[in-house]
Amino acid sequence: MKRALRRAIASLAPAAAEAGVRVLLYHAIDGPDAADRMGLRVSREAFREQMQLLHTAGYRVVPLTRMLEAPSFSRDVAITFDDGYRSEMRAAETLKEFGFTATFFVVPRFLDGMQQPAHYWEHWPHMSWDDARALVEGGFEIGAHSMTHPDLTRCDAGRLIEEVAGVKALLERRLEHEIVSFSYPYGRHNRHVRETAGRAGYRLACTSRYGINRPAGACYNVARTEVTAMDRLVDFRRKLQGKYDWLARWQDLR
């Protein structure tokens, strides 16, 4: 759907009425790349502006695990990052300045430096195991984003267990940090994938479907609002308000 049409609809859409946790989804926080047709690289300047807006507008940035608790404040926001890009380390420094927390979903294949890039976004530098440990020591949460970043809905039973349960065991052993959250690669999941995440011991599993979340304990269908390089500050504000949540229906149709 054309960006101009999305913005026009969002400008007229009502704000979300229900209280809950809005989970933001970021990827790389870095300069533009001509190959980045999906807008995965949000600039450092834009990211800082967005964090400043959260601060001045009175949003409360909470850990993703806040969703496991009782019903929340209506302006709760959780911040998440997928793929474990090295540029996310700079984002962590900005978050510290504002006193914000976040969850970083990492992939051991990338942490090991064995990328064998198959997509343009895999060519970007990724953080190391030492970087992941530094995030844990800095008070951030590390979550799992699978072992190698496949489409889990296409994995056979044995590989699915390794990608979902095996990565949890590996991260916990290497980082000495309990892993309770999972992010589905590409946002793709089905009943079998969700059940595997539950049996592996995760309490939360994140999608890339727009929407707001009402805390009610363990959840394997966490909605997230993606922030992209194409978002202006007014777009970011509208996403916080839920004015883009109608896109979830469009995602379902696709």
Give the residues covered by each predicted segment:
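C-terminal active-site subregion of NodB/CE4 polysaccharide deacetylases
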Residues: 1-80, 85-88, 154-254
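Alpha-helical scaffolding within the catalytic cores
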Residues: 7-10, 89-90, 118-137, 210
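Acidic (Asp/Glu)-rich catalytic clusters
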Residues: 16, 55-56, 93-100, 125-144, ...
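Short loop/turn segments at strand-loop or loop-helix junctions that form parts
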Residues: 25-29, 107-109, 145-147
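Acidic/aromatic-lined carbohydrate-recognition and catalytic surfaces
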Residues: 81, 85-100, 111
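A short, conserved beta-to-alpha structural element at the edge of catalytic cores
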Residues: 100-122
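Histidine/lysine/aspartate-rich catalytic loop segments that bind and position anionic ligands
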Residues: 110, 127-162
